[in-house]
Amino acid sequence: MAEAEESPGDPGTASPRPLFAGLSDISISQDIPVEGEITIPMRSRIREFDSSTLNESVRNTIMRDLKAVGKKFMHVLYPRKSNTLLRDWDLWGPLILCVTLALMLQRDSADSEKDGGPQFAEVFVIVWFGAVTITLNSKLLGGNISFFQSLCVLGYCILPLTVAMLICRLVLLADPGPVNFMVRLFVVIVMFAWSIVASTAFLADSQPPNRRALAVYPVFLFYFVISWMILTFTPQ
């Protein structure tokens, strides 16, 4: 170890001492913690979730997903301001609703292509293309909602119109006439308004206050087109 230089004032009596000898007098305060744990709660939670889902059976996975879809259906049927659809988004519910609606709008006759009736692929494309267009419009207006969250909300809010389509199919089993049309018109208008209220309840707060009208207007057109296809549907 290097030695310190002798004192110039008293060269005869100075004795060499270690250069870092004074460091031994430094003490650490008892109030300062010198040990602890480094934990990352979020990663550990994600790791536990992954391990739990990997170890569960296929039946439990399907039932868990169906319960989640059912809860989101209830949020649409009883619309209120909530972040459930935005926080726990999925596309299973919108896919089920879109396929169901497209199947019910499919005409029974083999000549439905010639009489102008909507085909399965046409309905499927209209629904998803419309949802994507509204989502891009929302992002361009400065909305703080992600792409898939918007698709999830718009898809789940088709539920009232799907119910309207089911009711209209049942009404069409009776003899056609003015009363038949008025009943279908009333059902479609009510379910159309229901879809608008449900979607705006989830999406309104995600838009800037001065641009909410610009964001809601395409949603109105989107559900109006679907409602028009339902109202003008005839089985033959």
Curated annotation (Swiss-Prot):
The keyword Transmembrane helix applies. Residues 106-115, 168-184, 234-236 are lumenal. It is a multi-pass membrane protein. GO terms for cellular component: cis-Golgi network; COPII-coated ER to Golgi transport vesicle; endoplasmic reticulum; Golgi medial cisterna; Golgi membrane; Golgi trans cisterna; trans-Golgi network. One of its GO terms (molecular function) is identical protein binding. Pfam families: Yip1. Keywords: Acetylation, Golgi apparatus, Membrane, Phosphoprotein, Transmembrane, Transmembrane helix. Predominantly interacts with YIPF1 or YIPF2, but may also form a ternary complex with YIPF1 and YIPF2. This interaction may stabilize YIPF1 and YIPF2. May be required for stable YIPF1 and YIPF2 protein expression. PANTHER family: GOLGI MEMBRANE PROTEIN YIP1, PROTEIN YIPF6. This is Protein YIPF6. It comes from Homo sapiens. The gene is YIPF6.
